[in-house]
């Protein structure tokens, strides 16, 4: 098998990322050399690659589904929104500009060249390249500058599968309409459809799928069921709805639950940090946006932000800032990560991200943050709570810690020996702990299993949850691998494999009809 295809969607969050991840895992299990690709992503959930670049977290997950180390090749252009109108532009893993729509147009020729070069390189190296679109190709107002949907498909002659989310309703109209509004040469690349998140008896849907095939001349390759047990790293903030749970809580090992309230910041970044907590039996994690929701939580997490000063102002306006201060004063557990850590310091000086200058923080931690370029992008390893830790840093802020004690020791080397043996390297103190609060710049910290267990025991003790017991064997990596295998099983079972292989190897069939709006 050799080829490439593009998985597009009728909307954002239709399921493009998970379908690509499932296909990647399915093909990798068969021994196919497969790689993911997303030409341009817009997301504040990102990871750091081994070579110090930054890519969307969804592409990192897809890479792991393929058995590959995440690389900037898989996501050469990343836009990180800092406001409704401006985003940080990351090219081949490095921030190069902060752009609005007009500024972005200046870069488009160079970006097309970057995208074309990376995709050509991957197609030469791998048997199959599975590309993911962005948003929806039906956003025809953006067609002239499109890098990730039909612009990519046309440039690289890629067949396209369109995914629609039936759980939101109107999926048949979405699928038909997506094709119908495209220009004729784009329509000719649409090879088929996938219906995602279906609940119930699929036979009841078949008449609609048959009619869709009559109207469009294109088949539906499969109907993927709504799998409540399936949850994977969120690509963007659409999955972080206030009052919504994270993952699916599992019954506690002991007699008590540990409840976690994760603050849903308006410009939240790396929201996936809390998913490691949700892997633990007896830990229930929920997104919150009101101060009243903090009262009953055993632990509050303040995650990262792409607009630290703006989100700090939001904490103050909503009363969450004062509620956080009161928690810490009372000795009740709070974990602040990256931007959240900076907000809880005494002072922020920001001439880089927001241009706001000097801003007072919430004063929980005795530290000052000054934003500077270039951005810190690094993988780290170290020790915390007597256990090895691994993670990564993505931030402009440089902190000066004064009175608070650090609680981590780190080294800027992802594979360094840190366990005290004769090859161990010296560690640099990192983070702050004071009262009931811990702060750190390190994302992914809670995925270090031994550290997470030891730290949760301390959190439970401080919260008075003496009946809470940490499971002795929870592995975040194993949970994620199991989720990818479950997803691959669903894709393998419910998608027409023969049709998929034909599209991959032969491209979109010739002679597909061109639809016109209003056609019936």
From Swiss-Prot:
Pathway this chain belongs to: Cofactor biosynthesis; adenosylcobalamin biosynthesis
CDD domains named in the record: CobQ_N, GATase1_CobQ
Family: Belongs to the CobB/CobQ family. CobQ subfamily.
PANTHER family: COBYRIC ACID SYNTHASE, DETHIOBIOTIN SYNTHETASE
GO biological process: cobalamin biosynthetic process
Function: Catalyzes amidations at positions B, D, E, and G on adenosylcobyrinic A,C-diamide. NH(2) groups are provided by glutamine, and one molecule of ATP is hydrogenolyzed for each amidation.
Signal peptide start-end: none
Protein name as catalogued: Cobyric acid synthase
Pfam families, per the entry: CbiA (PF01656), GATase_3 (PF07685)
Active site (catalytic residues): 338, 443
Residue ranges of the TM segments: none
Gene from which the chain derives: cobQ
Organism expressing this protein natively: Nocardia farcinica (strain IFM 10152)
Residue intervals of the GATase cobBQ-type domain: 257-451
Keyword presence, Protein biosynthesis: no
